[in-house]
């Protein structure tokens, strides 16, 4: 209270602003009522009325100043402290708990925000903290709240563990856990690439084909580096020759090579690129046996087909890195039956060949195309190669079926050529020659009414011309004007 008395002296200066109410304020300062002769009584009354006002103002100023002092004391932070202190009590109280608690407990607020900002979660978290001291772990580290959501194993060991030391260990152990899920995560992407399941329709043996796809999905999680894909396909060919040449062995052979490459490629981890590279070769093999089984010369061709597939697969890998169509013709010449090597180049040809040869196969293989295009780059990179089919017309059916699809997949030029080839156009000679141009005076009916009055037609009729004559003349004029246009 000793402080308020000094402020009253300053209040007199503030009163001057209110003087607009009347000149009385100066009279109090200069007590003489004589200066204002007209209203001396008023001046005497005003000071008596204004004195309480001054006192009230001084009280208001004192209150305001006190408020400012209270703000300087920063009681607001103290008010916020008790809330954090409550959480401190639940967690841990150290010698320097004041600053440390504030600094360490601010993250829990972030944790609450991450948790969703629901007030209900806070007491639940505090209860867990009271049960086990691991609560400080999330407090000290904001990311920890996220970890419990991903892997609950982290927070569970923490309660048994002591304070931050073990909590940090648990968090470190919990952090590697997320990468592990990321490692198994690749299997979901791998299932789309495995196109072997659709293969069964091409080859009679379905059970054996169904069994191989399962192992690749299991082994594929480790699949990562793409560079090795080209090398692994080469080893699989040796296992292919051992099978016997007979047609019955052919189907088994087609199945066995598939099993071998499926198990081998996953080891040299070629996840995205190899499955498209290797699988087309596999597709070519089942297609070739199907064709060969139907054709009479089945026994002789079996040995040659195994060697060509590795070449086309390697060529396909190289073509994806740098497009090189020539290897395909070489493979075509080397193989006794050219159609099988072509499919590895692009999956689109497989379906086109499957349509003429095996009737049941087109549906599943069409699904294969969608799956392959879905995984991504393989479909886009295979677009340019489709040109070769026209170069190597192995069979009329295959070449005809491949040309339209391949050209449509090529650039716009091929599409334009196909579009024009669908229609027959007449030459300039087929059309009748235009009428010869003869200069003549032209009369435009639109200009006639402008030059003459609206009653010109009536005048013309009066002159002896009937409306029919006028109409015939106009029609003739319009006919003459048409050729000029």
Swiss-Prot record:
Gene Ontology cellular component list: early endosome; synapse; WASH complex
Motif WASP-binding motif: positions: 424-448
Motif Profilin-binding motif boundaries: 3-8, 11-16, 31-36
Keyword Phosphoprotein: yes
Domain comment (free text): The WH2 domain is found in a number of putative actin-binding proteins. The profilin-binding motif has been implicated in the interaction with profilin and SH3 domains.
Name of the protein in its database record: WAS/WASL-interacting protein family member 3
Disruption phenotype: Mice are normal but males are sterile due to defects in spermatogenesis.
Residue numbers carrying Phosphoserine: 161, 211, 392
Expressing tissues: Isoform 1 is expressed in brain and testis and isoform 2 is expressed only in brain (at protein level).
Subunit structure: Interacts with WASL, and monomeric and filamentous actin.
Alphabetical GO biological process terms: Arp2/3 complex-mediated actin nucleation; cell differentiation; spermatogenesis
Annotated function: May be a regulator of cytoskeletal organization (Potential). May have a role in spermatogenesis.
Keywords noted in UniProt: Actin-binding, Cytoplasm, Developmental protein, Differentiation, Methylation, Phosphoprotein, Spermatogenesis
Pfam family, one: WH2
PANTHER family in UniProt: CXYORF1, WAS_WASL-INTERACTING PROTEIN FAMILY MEMBER 3
Ranges for domain WH2: 56-73
Encoding gene per record: Wipf3
Compositionally biased spans, kind Basic and acidic residues: 415-439
Subcellular location: Cytoplasm
Positions carrying Asymmetric dimethylarginine: 57
Composition bias type Pro residues, residue spans: 1-41, 176-203, 212-246, 263-278, 296-312
One Gene Ontology molecular-function label: alpha-tubulin binding
Disordered, as annotated region: 1-485
PROSITE patterns listed in its UniProt record: WH2
Chief location: cytoplasm
Originating species: Mus musculus
Residue interval(s) of motif RLRK: 69-72
